[in-house]
Structures are given as C-alpha cells and as structure tokens.
Amino acid sequence: MRPSKRAADAMRDVTLERAVARYAEGSCLVTFGNTRVLCTASLEERGPPWLRGSGKGWVTAEYAMLPRATHERTRREVNSGKPSGRTQEIQRLIGRSLRAVTNLPALGERQITVDCDVIQADGGTRTASITGAWVALHDCFAWMRARSIISVDPLKDHVAAVSCGIYKGQPVLDLDYAEDSAAETDANFVVTGKGGIVEVQGTAEMEPFSEAQFIELLALAKGGIANLVELQRKAIA
C-alpha cells in the first residue's frame, strides 16, 4: 500500500493555472498534489552571445526553491554564491526539455528564460516544473504572436514529465516525498505529446532494477504523461 493510498498507476491531483503573474509574458502555477511550482516565461530581445548572427533563438531555464518550500528552512542559494549541483542539473533538464519541442529559428535572435520557483516541495519538483514550464512557454509565444513579434508558433509539440519508482517492490507512478525517500528505484521521464522520449533519469537506490522493471516504469510514465498532456491541452484551450 502506498502512503497516499493511491493505485500504482494513479497520479496525484494535478492542476495548471495560467496567467498567475501579472508582468510575465507567460506564467503557470502547477501543482502535483502538495508540490507547487510557479513557472514564468520572460522574453529578452537578444539571444545568447554564441548565437549572435545565426538567426536562431534560445530557450533556457532557471530553478529555485523558496527557503520554506521544505519541512525545514533551507538557505537561499544566492547567499552561497552559486547554485548547487542539484539546482544546475534540474534547470539544465528543464531547458533541454523545452528546447526539444521548440523551433528555435522561428524565435529569431531572442531568448526566453523560464523561471521555475518551487513554493512547496513534496516530491517531483523537476517533473512538475517541466510540465508547468511548457504552459508558461506556450503563453509567452502566444503573447509574442499577438504583438507580431513572431509570425508562427515556435512550439512543435507538448512536453511533460513524471516520476516513477519501485516502492516496496512495486512499480508506482508519480512519487511524493514519502515514497521518493524510501523507494528502491527512482526515475524521471520526459516525453513529448507524440510519445518521443526526451530524457530518462533512473537510479537504483538499493538493489539494481531489471530490464523488465524498467519497461514497467516506462509504461507507467507514458500513461501518466498522456494524462498530463491532455491537462495541458485543456489548460490552453
């Protein structure tokens, strides 16, 4: 039995609330159960230096947790002088995931920065961030098109992410903190709306997992992401 009493293939309640930040070109408050992340997409009228003269744009991401997003207060990373290795890994993952479904030349030489700020963490902050970031990016592009900054939608597809793991010997979908902290295996899957795999992160915390178990986790993830993509579609309708 899962601590949340969910079925093995059941996700937490997921919500995607748009236009929650007044000044951002695109924004989304995403919740996966008790995990809450504010995603904002901001337009900069210049791209990174290494793309100057290429005609291509760029999409990047930054990730942070509020000090009291966790059970005990964590120190703001800005006070330590640089982001932690975990933070750098997650924000690079978010950026890669968004670029995988973006036609960068359609942006022109501009950059979109998507900020993902965790308000409350209960497992799955990176997967919630990717799922909500896509909605914020979608709305940023819609804002740009409405003002004739770009002529076509740069988004090629949806992208969403979900965690899976093996908890007490059973493959389960969308781990919360209680499950994640005790799981034998923890994995994150990033998948497009058409079913293309963008990234897989998987770790055996205790015993190695088998190929058959990995296939089970992948099947759970694809089912969960199909539901997330449908929620994205409804959110932007």
Curated annotation (Swiss-Prot):
Enzyme Commission number: 2.7.7.56
GO biological process: rRNA catabolic process; rRNA processing; tRNA processing
GO MF term list: 3'-5'-RNA exonuclease activity; tRNA binding; tRNA nucleotidyltransferase activity
SUPFAM superfamilies: Ribonuclease PH domain 2-like, Ribosomal protein S5 domain 2-like
Quaternary structure and partners: Homohexameric ring arranged as a trimer of dimers.
Protein name, per record: Ribonuclease PH
PANTHER family, A to Z: EXOSOME COMPLEX COMPONENT (PTHR11953), EXOSOME COMPLEX COMPONENT RRP41 (PTHR11953:SF0)
HAMAP family on file: RNase_PH
Reactions catalysed according to its record: tRNA(n+1) + phosphate = tRNA(n) + a ribonucleoside 5'-diphosphate
NCBIfam families, A to Z: RNasePH (TIGR01966)
Database matches in Gene3D superfamilies: GHMP Kinase, N-terminal domain
Pfam families per the UniProt record, alphabetical: RNase_PH, RNase_PH_C
Positions bound to phosphate: R86, G124, T125, R126
Alphabetic keyword roster: Nucleotidyltransferase, RNA-binding, rRNA processing, Transferase, tRNA processing, tRNA-binding
Family from the record: Belongs to the RNase PH family.
Role: Phosphorolytic 3'-5' exoribonuclease that plays an important role in tRNA 3'-end maturation. Removes nucleotide residues following the 3'-CCA terminus of tRNAs; can also add nucleotides to the ends of RNA molecules by using nucleoside diphosphates as substrates, but this may not be physiologically important. Probably plays a role in initiation of 16S rRNA degradation (leading to ribosome degradation) during starvation.
Enzyme class, broadest EC rank: transferase
